[in-house]
Amino acid sequence: MDCKIEIIPRVLHFKQPAGTSRGTYTTRKVWYLHFTAPEFPNWVGIGECAPLPNLSCDDLPDYAEVLAKICRQVENQGGKLDMEALCKYPSILFGLETAIRHFFEGSWALWDTPFSRGEAGIPINGLIWMGDFNRMLAQIEKKMEAGFRCIKLKIGAINFEEELALLQHIRSHYSSKEIELRVDANGAFSPTDAMEKLKRLSELDLHSIEQPIRAGQWEEMARLTSESPLPIALDEELI
């Protein structure tokens, strides 16, 4: 099938700075893909490629050039994807898969589920971006007022003792039955101090921690997951 993929770059602006252990985001560059085919002139499929700077494994200095090259290859292959070759570019694979599936479904409702039919919701956590103590506390209180009962905090950017104090403040007012707490370090801890920090965090009755150390340190991560008193959820490690 003859097809065409148009690449549309955009810069999105955060309504408020989004802090992580790798820095604070105020903008986000994304590339939208428009998948079309002359055979079906009224159809279009839209996908989004959005690698996170300093976090995504395919955050490349020549990302735009790589994306353009891959899109031309997909056009030459009639819209077929080389899944094995694209595994190292997960954000590009996601954008292409979404655009192509959207094109052939002809609808944003890609799956027939109670959620897509508007019959049921999906429980999610209230995400708290990094900031100073008072700013994070204000975010938490706002999420709880909105009805969230699972709170996830980004940690690793401010002083660890301040982060502990913030978690202790929450626990002093709400038990684990009232509020489920999760934390995400985005690889902020070093292998040498990670275990001590995990032990201290575990005393606060947390549900889990995501990515305590940077991805790719498999032996260290294996040791931590086997010895940590706090359950570890893999995040960047899985990409």
Predicted regions and their residues:
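A short, conserved beta-to-alpha structural element at the edge of catalytic cores
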Residues: D205-G216
